[in-house]
């Protein structure tokens, strides 16, 4: 081959190479920033968290793996899988994004859906991002741009996660963006809200709405495109209720408009206005004294609220739960959701109040006790309460009082010093007071009293000895055979009271034994008379030779 031919071939190859190179350059130049391309996953680097995606020719883009990873951490795409990506930068290794591609496709679909008549169309979404110019709002998977000047939001606050409503004001097909405005929404909505509110107020039939938000003071319901507040007192005929127990976001509910504040642009709605007033219905169906079945709906320390049905709630006061006076808390007897039978004790339709009783459907424990026991019966009771004056014993449904002076023969003893809560004591019924529903008990009457023991050893007019244990204004007490014996002031003669000392031994004669009152009285004065009487008797029966003078000499 000649040199000329070789040169020609070289020139042809160079020309062909140049053409091919130019075509490749043209291909790369068509890969503009912001383009959506169908690429191919060519490699996955899990350690560094990225995948390389071929987007045409020799160009490969870097894709973050977190964009194609599900909630469980599993990759949605594998090597050699086709994938749609958004090209964020030009060059040999541009940045690509799967999420942006999907988002841009959704935006484009929304733009086509809106058509030409998009202006002032209302969207509701959540703020998911923020940039220098404003906020990104997401609604049904589509991202919208809310500029700061159209946001009506405070610049110094964090609004991420906040739900907003806005009007569409601009659509950019080339840049795949939709601009929205809260400022425009308020302008459009205020006018529309006034018109629709008037329409709702004039409506005679309930309107179907959707629960949009639940708060402690009520629920916001959207009806005919505008929102109104159903105050918690307008939810049920029961009165104020907890909104969260009745509804959740997204629930459909019928409402009626009851007021509109034009100055504050607030629409008030009511749910209970759409329901027939049950209080009018029950006036002819329920009467005091009727027994009805109810369900416990709420428990407080002061009583229980019960659901009667038909949106009516009754109140069971804590004192009407049990005949037991020691009801510490209603939840010790009842639980929410429990079905019980109660007796109606009062109906007040005007004030929407209905009171019921649980205990009045059972026999009064006192009446049951009275039918089974009588005065004098001996039984056991458990100490329920201790006081300064005695102890209350539980006798099985009723309490009886064991007073200190009926518990011990020793008047200085007290129940609280000798018993504890839960002790079981054998007692005797002293009294059953039907009028006041009270029971008096005694423990001391089941044991022999000190006076009875004393009476077994001593009779009236017998002589006893004892030491002085106390001196009172009315007399002196001596202890004789384990019992305190009273010597009144008038019975001390010939002893002088002001000369008597504690511990002094006194001889006297028994003048009275009161077993029922556990009292013994004695007299020194009567002892002297007794001695004189005995001496006189001795004189009358003595030898005639003994004279009265002799007797007197002996005394002297």
Swiss-Prot record:
- Entry keyword Methyltransferase: no
Name one cellular component (GO) term. Answer: cytosolic small ribosomal subunit
Q: Name one GO molecular function term.
A: structural constituent of ribosome
Q: Which Pfam families does the entry link to? A: S1
Q: Which CDD domains match?
A: S1_like, S1_RPS1_repeat_ec2_hs2
InterPro entries reported for this sequence: NA-bd_OB-fold, Ribos_protein_bS1-like, Ribosomal_bS1, Ribosomal_protein_S1-like, S1_domain
Query: Per the UniProt entry, what is one GO biological process?
Result: translation
Q: Give the keywords, sorted.
A: Repeat, Ribonucleoprotein, Ribosomal protein, RNA-binding
Ranges where the S1 motif domain occurs: 35-105, 120-183, 204-272, 289-359, 377-444, 461-525
Superkingdom of the source species: Bacteria
Protein family per UniProt: Belongs to the bacterial ribosomal protein bS1 family.
The role this protein plays is: Binds mRNA; thus facilitating recognition of the initiation point. It is needed to translate mRNA with a short Shine-Dalgarno (SD) purine-rich sequence.
Mind telling me what this protein is named?
Small ribosomal subunit protein bS1
Top-level taxonomy: Bacteria, Pseudomonadati, Campylobacterota, Epsilonproteobacteria, Campylobacterales
């Amino acid at each position: 081959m000649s040199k000329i031919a070789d040169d020609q071939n070289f020139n042809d190859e160079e020309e062909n190479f140049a053409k091919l190179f130019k075509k490749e350059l043209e291909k790369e130049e068509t890969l503009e920033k912001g383009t959506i391309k169908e690429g191919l996953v060519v490699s996955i680097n899990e350690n560094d968290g990225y995948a390389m995606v071929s987007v045409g020719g020799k160009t490969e883009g870097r894709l973050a793996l977190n964009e194609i990873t599900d909630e469980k951490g599993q990759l949605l795409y594998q090597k050699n899988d086709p994938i749609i990506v958004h090209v964020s930068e030009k060059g040999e290794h541009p940045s690509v994004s799967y999420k942006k591609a999907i988002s841009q496709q959704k935006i484009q679909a929304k733009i086509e859906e809106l058509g030409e008549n998009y202006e002032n169309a209302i969207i509701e979404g959540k703020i998911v991002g923020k940039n220098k110019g404003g906020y990104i709002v997401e609604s049904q998977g589509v991202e919208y741009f809310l500029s700061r000047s159209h946001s009506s939001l405070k610049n110094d606050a964090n609004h991420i996660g906040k739900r907003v409503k806005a009007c569409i004001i601009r659509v950019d097909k080339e840049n795949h963006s939709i601009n929205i405005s809260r400022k425009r929404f308020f302008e459009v909505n205020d006018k529309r809200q006034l018109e629709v509110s008037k329409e709702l107020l004039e409506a005679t039939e309930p309107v179907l709405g959707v629960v949009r938000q639940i708060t402690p003071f009520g629920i916001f319901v959207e009806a005919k495109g505008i929102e109104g507040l159903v105050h918690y007192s307008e939810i049920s005929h029961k009165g104020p209720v907890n909104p969260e127990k009745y509804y959740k976001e997204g629930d459909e509910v019928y409402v009626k408009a009851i007021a509109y504040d034009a100055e504050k642009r607030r629409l008030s709605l009511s749910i209970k206005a759409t329901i027939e007033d049950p209080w009018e219905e029950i006036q002819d169906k329920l009467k005091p004294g009727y027994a009805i079945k109810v369900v416990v709906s709420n428990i407080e320390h002061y009583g229980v609220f019960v659901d009667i049905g038909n949106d009516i709630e009754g109140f069971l006061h804590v004192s009407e739960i049990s005949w037991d006076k020691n009801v510490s808390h209603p939840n010790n007897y009842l639980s929410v959701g429990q079905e019980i039978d109660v007796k109606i004790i009062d109906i007040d339709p005007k004030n929407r109040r209905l009171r019921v009783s649980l205990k009045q459907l059972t026999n009064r424990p006192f009446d049951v006790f009275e039918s089974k026991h009588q005065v004098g019966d001996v039984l056991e009771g458990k100490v329920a309460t201790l006081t300064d004056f005695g102890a209350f014993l539980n006798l099985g449904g009723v309490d009886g009082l064991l007073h200190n002076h009926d518990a011990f023969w020793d008047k200085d003893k007290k129940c609280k010093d000798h018993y504890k809560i839960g002790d079981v004591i054998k007692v005797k019924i002293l009294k059953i007071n039907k009028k006041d529903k009270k029971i008096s008990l005694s423990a001391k009457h089941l044991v022999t009293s000190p006076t009875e023991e004393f009476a077994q050893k001593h009779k009236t007019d017998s002589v006893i000895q004892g030491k002085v244990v106390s001196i009172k204004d009315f007399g002196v007490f001596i202890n004789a055979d384990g019992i305190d014996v009273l010597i009144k002031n008038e019975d001390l003669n010939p002893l002088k009271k002001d000369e008597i000392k504690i511990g002094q031994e006194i001889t006297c004669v028994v003048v009275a034994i009161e077993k029922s009152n556990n009292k013994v009285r004695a007299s020194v004065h009567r002892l002297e008379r007794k001695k004189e009487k005995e001496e006189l008797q001795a004189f009358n029966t003595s030898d005639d030779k003994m004279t009265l003078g002799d007797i007197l000499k002996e005394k002297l």
